[in-house]
């Protein structure tokens, strides 16, 4: 991914770069984003800094907040240290439940603590408001559901 970020910076385009971070350290990011085992957080941040240096465009970091996984006070402090001094927006998205996945949405108290730590450290952060989660149409919930069906032959389709 860092080589692609460097290529994007060289294009002199008007693209806004959004990086899916989801964890403030390699140990946790290796679990959540398997490609991190090949490209660590440090290398990713170096590429992001290069993009900013070349383009002058503010970076966006995406962080899906998962209850009991990446929403601790320690995670917030580590994230603050990682982003401190960068011209960037941190877009935090509290997890929206998806059937079949083990993750949970953090409590309102956990979200508030996480936000307070980041804001106290001077991090520019936006917490996405949950919309559509009651009808499974929120961020992360829109995905194809498979159904058992018998494929139609061309003749059967023509007869229908």
What are these regions (language model features)?
Residues 20-21, 129-131:
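Residues at the C-termini of beta-strands that transition into short coil/loop
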Residues 1-121:
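Conserved AdoMet/S-adenosylmethionine-binding subsite of the radical SAM
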Residues 112, 125-127, 140:
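Short alpha-helical segments used as structural interaction elements across diverse proteins
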Residues 92, 126-129:
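A structural preference for short, hydrophobic beta-strand core positions in alpha/beta folds
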Residues 132-160:
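Radical SAM enzyme core and accessory elements
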């Amino acid at each position: 991914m860092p080589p692609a970020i460097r290529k994007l910076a060289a294009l002199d385009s008007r693209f806004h770069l959004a990086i899916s971070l989801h964890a403030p350290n390699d140990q946790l990011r290796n679990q959540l984003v398997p490609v991190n085992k090949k490209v660590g957080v440090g290398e990713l941040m170096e590429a992001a800094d290069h993009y900013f240096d070349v383009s002058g465009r503010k970076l966006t970091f995406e962080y899906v907040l998962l209850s009991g996984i990446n929403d601790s006070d320690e995670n917030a402090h580590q994230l603050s240290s990682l982003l401190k001094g960068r011209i960037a927006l941190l877009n935090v998205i509290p997890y929206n439940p998806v059937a079949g996945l083990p993750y949970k949405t953090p409590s309102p108290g956990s979200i508030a603590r996480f936000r307070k730590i980041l804001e106290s450290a001077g991090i520019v952060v936006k917490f996405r408001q949950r919309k559509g989660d009651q009808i499974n149409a929120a961020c992360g919930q829109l995905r194809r559901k498979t159904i058992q069906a018998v494929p139609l032959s061309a003749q059967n389709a023509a007869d229908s």
